[in-house]
């Protein structure tokens, strides 16, 4: 491939010059600076400026001044963005304190409390130090009950059970009185921090503080005991809450269903669903997902499927979300046969899955279901309005091409175009790759022409994909043609490009040209990777050039690259041919040390070499270690050892066979 470097260099230089001319040389100074010389914000006020303000000790004064003077309006999205993007949780708290006092609407916004809670959890813990309490007092603000609930919630998620308890015991010093809301926050935090006993203690203290447990209190405790698998206690709590006039809701029953399934009590979980029906409580999406996933979690997959199908026959409450959950579980467990059965059954009921659920189900079917039947199911759902999407079509096309059902694969490729799914270089590249791997490169070339006719320019990945297809064939002429197109389009070859060209030359037995290309690669300043070296090492070994393969192996390790199994095997074989068995054994030890499992080729090569060098006992010892290192001996490896035993007894295989 001489001349490759010079022609590519000319095109690369021109491309670099073009990029330089098109580059922007100036930046809008108003956008690059957030503070002017006087420390005032640029207009409009931006998030970075706010972040700088709340780092200061006089943050509340500046915020009040800026938002009053400039009359800059706040909106929920902006507030959320500021809260989320602070590295210090104290800054998130400061901004929330200010904004919730500046406009009472934000104090009632549940989404802001959730965002603040997440920020305090991710960056925290933020503890109530004396300095922080003084700062809040000096700012003229106070910690409200709602804010205290957010803080307690973050501590609970961080596992600070004792701290939650200690702070709650001293809330009177913060000007607060115990309330059911605060008790609920503490009990929830204690449950989340795995301190159920302490949560029960707080539950028992509520009434002495004049706070009556409500439905939230009971649901929190029921959730805690169900997580532990103590479902009988959960049932007792449900009875107690009913006696106090707190009727269980959908969340209560969802928690109970999950608890019974965690405990493996499927029948009891089904009874809870029946109880919901009797009480005219409709299961929500969380209930149904909990039920389906719980059934699959506590029963063997086939039994779980049987239970759910039986439930579906009796009760129509499974709904669409239930069908989605069942399909997800079937796909996740690679149950192709059951997935096909379920799709047919729910399809008859008019169920139409969304694209992601359908694609997951199709991927499962393609791994183990009859391909013709899979296509029939696919076509049936598409005719009813399902939109499989690009990936849904592509996995089916790949399966058909692998099965050499080319006409059917082409039909779906055509439909992808009709549905407008081929609209970018990325989608075309995926189709071209699919066709190249199926050895249908001529068809792939048609898609290249089509994409260019539509004004979609190929990229380097496109050309590398074609190089990969022709490289496997060892078609040097075609590879050269693709390379010329790649350069004409102004692309600089990368390590993948060079490796594919080298692989093609090696497959065509043009080893000298392969090493010339390797040299040009280095001249271009492109560092070879493991794949490049492994290709050359294997090729040298296959042509008997053992010296060069050993040198490449050493160079590869010198550059910090890890040879693969095939490179190790090829080098071990080279050493054995050179009668340097000790070096070959050292490589085997290296493989085991770095966690690379030798295969039967590795062991048979060494066993044969040890045997031929008169080291029969070591050959047998190596054979006995094969299974210990995670490899099952094949028939050839076993035969080598059998011949050793026969030789030792003075017999030949032919003599044994004749007798």
UniProtKB/Swiss-Prot annotation:
Q: What is its main location?
A: mitochondrion
> What residue range does the UniProt record give for the transit peptide?
1-32
Q: Which Pfam families match?
A: PPR, PPR_2
Any one Gene Ontology biological process term? mitochondrial ATP synthesis coupled electron transport
Q: Does this UniProt record's set of keywords contain Repeat?
A: yes
Which Gene3D superfamilies does the UniProt record give? Tetratricopeptide repeat domain
Superkingdom of origin: Eukaryota
Keywords from the UniProt entry: Mitochondrion, Repeat, Transit peptide
**Residue spans of the PPR repeats:** 109-143, 144-178, 179-213, 214-248, 249-283, 284-318, 319-353, 354-388, 389-423, 424-458, 459-493, 494-528, 529-563, 564-598, 599-633
Q: Which InterPro entries match?
A: Pentatricopeptide_rpt, PPR-containing_protein, TPR-like_helical_dom_sf
Protein's UniProt keywords contain ATP-binding: no
Q: Name one GO cellular component term.
A: mitochondrion
Where is this gene product found?
Mitochondrion
What PANTHER family does this protein map onto? Answer: MEMBRANE-ASSOCIATED SALT-INDUCIBLE PROTEIN-LIKE, OS03G0201400 PROTEIN
Family affiliation: Belongs to the PPR family. P subfamily.
Q: What does this protein do?
A: Required for the ubiquinol-cytochrome c oxidoreductase activity of mitochondrial complex III.
Q: What is this protein called?
A: Putative pentatricopeptide repeat-containing protein At3g16890, mitochondrial
Native organism is Arabidopsis thaliana (Mouse-ear cress)
């Amino acid at each position: 491939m001489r001349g490759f470097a010079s022609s590519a260099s000319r095109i690369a230089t021109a491309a670099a010059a073009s990029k330089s001319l098109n580059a922007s040389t100036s930046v809008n100074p108003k956008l690059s600076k957030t503070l002017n010389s006087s420390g005032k914000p640029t207009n409009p006020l931006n998030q970075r400026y706010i972040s700088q303000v709340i780092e200061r000790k006089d943050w509340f004064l500046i915020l009040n001044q800026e938002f009053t003077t400039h009359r800059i309006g706040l909106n929920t999205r902006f507030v959320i963005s500021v809260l989320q993007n602070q590295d210090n949780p104290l800054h998130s708290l400061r901004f929330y304190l200010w904004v919730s006092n500046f406009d009472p609407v934000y104090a009632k916004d549940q989404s802001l409390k959730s965002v603040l809670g997440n920020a305090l959890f991710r960056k925290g813990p933020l503890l109530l130090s004396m300095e922080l309490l003084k700062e809040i007092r000096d700012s003229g603000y106070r910690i409200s009950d709602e804010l205290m609930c957010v803080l307690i919630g973050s501590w609970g998620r961080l596992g600070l059970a004792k701290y939650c308890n200690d702070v709650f015991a001293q809330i009177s010093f913060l000007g607060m009185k115990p309330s059911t809301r605060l008790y609920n926050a503490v009990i929830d935090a204690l449950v989340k921090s795995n301190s159920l006993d302490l949560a029960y203690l707080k539950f028992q203290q509520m009434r002495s503080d004049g706070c009556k447990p409500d439905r939230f209190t009971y649901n929190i405790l029921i959730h805690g005991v169900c997580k532990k698998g103590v479902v009988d206690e959960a049932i007792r709590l449900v009875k107690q809450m009913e006696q106090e006039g707190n009727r269980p809701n959908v969340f209560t029953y969802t928690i109970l269903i999950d608890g019974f399934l965690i405990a493996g009590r499927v029948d009891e979980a089904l009874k809870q669903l029946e109880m919901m029906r009797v009480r005219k409580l409709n299961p929500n999406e969380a209930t149904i997902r909990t039920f389906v996933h719980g059934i699959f979690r506590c029963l063997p997959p086939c039994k779980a499927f049987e239970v759910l199908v039986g439930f579906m026959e009796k009760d129509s409450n499974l709904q669409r979300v239930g069908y989605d959950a069942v399909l997800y579980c079937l796909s996740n467990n690679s149950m192709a046969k059951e997935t096909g059965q379920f799709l047919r059954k729910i399809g008859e009921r008019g169920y139409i899955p969304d694209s992601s659920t359908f694609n997951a189900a199709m991927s499962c079917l393609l791994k183990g279901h009859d391909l013709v039947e899979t296509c029939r199911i696919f076509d049936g759902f598409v005719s009813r309005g399902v939109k499989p999407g690009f990936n849904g079509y592509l996995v089916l096309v790949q399966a058909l091409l692998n099965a050499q059902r080319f006409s059917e694969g082409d039909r779906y490729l055509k439909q992808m175009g009709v549905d407008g799914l081929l609209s970018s270089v990325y989608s075309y590249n995926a189709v071209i790759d699919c066709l190249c791997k199926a050895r249908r490169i001529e068809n792939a070339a048609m898609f290249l022409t089509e994409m260019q006719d539509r004004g979609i320019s190929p990229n380097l990945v496109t050309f590398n994909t074609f190089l990969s297809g022709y490289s496997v064939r060892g078609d040097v002429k075609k590879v050269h043609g693709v390379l010329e197109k790649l350069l004409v389009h102004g692309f600089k070859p990368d390590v993948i490009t060079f490796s594919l060209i080298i692989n093609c030359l090696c497959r065509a037995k043009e080893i000298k040209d392969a090493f010339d290309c390797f040299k040009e690669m280095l001249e271009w300043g492109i560092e070879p990777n493991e794949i490049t070296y492994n290709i050359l090492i294997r090729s040298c070994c296959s042509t008997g050039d053992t010296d060069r393969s050993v040198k490449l192996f050493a160079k590869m390790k010198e550059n910090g690259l890890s040879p693969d199994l095939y490179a190790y095997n090829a080098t071990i074989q080279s050493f054995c041919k050179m009668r340097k068995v000790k070096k070959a054994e050292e490589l085997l030890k290296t493989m085991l040390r770095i966690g690379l499992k030798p295969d039967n080729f590795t062991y048979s090569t060494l066993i044969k070499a040890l045997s031929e060098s008169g080291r029969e006992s070591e050959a047998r010892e190596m054979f006995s270690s094969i299974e210990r290192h995670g490899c099952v001996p094949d028939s050839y490896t076993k035969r080598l050892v059998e011949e050793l035993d026969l030789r030792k007894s003075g017999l030949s295989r032919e003599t044994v066979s004749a007798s």
